[in-house]
Amino acid sequence: MQKLVLTLLVTSLLAGCSIFGVYKVDIPQGTPLTKAQASQVQVGMNFQQVRFLLGSPTVTDPLNPLRWDYIYNYIPGTYAKKAKIPAAHGQHLKIYFDGTGTVTKIEGLETIPESQPGLPASKEAILTAPPL
């Protein structure tokens, strides 16, 4: 009988640990861009100018090195969800170059937001963790 009571007590204590939930970290993936940054890229610029403005591309296709992709996804973690920082999905800027390394086409500017949470130029508040 004592084993049964002890087993039930330990089981109920361990089940109580799930009340607090699991801490989840923020998951930023890719290159965060703002519309102000992306709109500076113009047709006629070269590789170096684009890399200076936007940084290295997130994806460069080895089979098509004349296309650069800047992709950004953000999944908020525990504290970001409490601060109501939204998730960011589907931000995909594509820049096409010709054989001489000059920009010929830019696609996806409409997917880039005005600001990104947590970036220095952003008007939105940066998430801060409470002191320990």
From Swiss-Prot:
InterPro entries (UniProt xref): BamE, BamE-like, BamE_dom
Example GO biological process: Gram-negative-bacterium-type cell outer membrane assembly
Show which residues constitute the signal peptide.
Answer: 1-16
Keywords of the record: Cell outer membrane, Lipoprotein, Membrane, Palmitate, Signal
Q: Where is the lipid attached (S-diacylglycerol cysteine)?
A: C17
PROSITE patterns noted in UniProt: PROKAR_LIPOPROTEIN
GO MF assignments: protein-macromolecule adaptor activity
- What is the membrane topology here? Lipid-anchor
Where does this protein reside within or beyond the cell?
Cell outer membrane
Gene3D superfamilies reported for this sequence: 3.30.1450.10
The highest taxon in the source lineage is: Bacteria
Please classify the protein's predominant subcellular localization into one broad category: membrane
Q: Name one GO cellular component term.
A: Bam protein complex
Q: Where is the lipid attached (N-palmitoyl cysteine)?
A: C17
Family (UniProt): Belongs to the BamE family.
User: Quaternary structure per UniProt?
Assistant: Part of the Bam complex.
The job of this chain, per UniProt, is described as: Part of the outer membrane protein assembly complex, which is involved in assembly and insertion of beta-barrel proteins into the outer membrane.
Q: What is this protein called?
A: Outer membrane protein assembly factor BamE
The species this protein was found in: Acinetobacter pittii (strain PHEA-2)
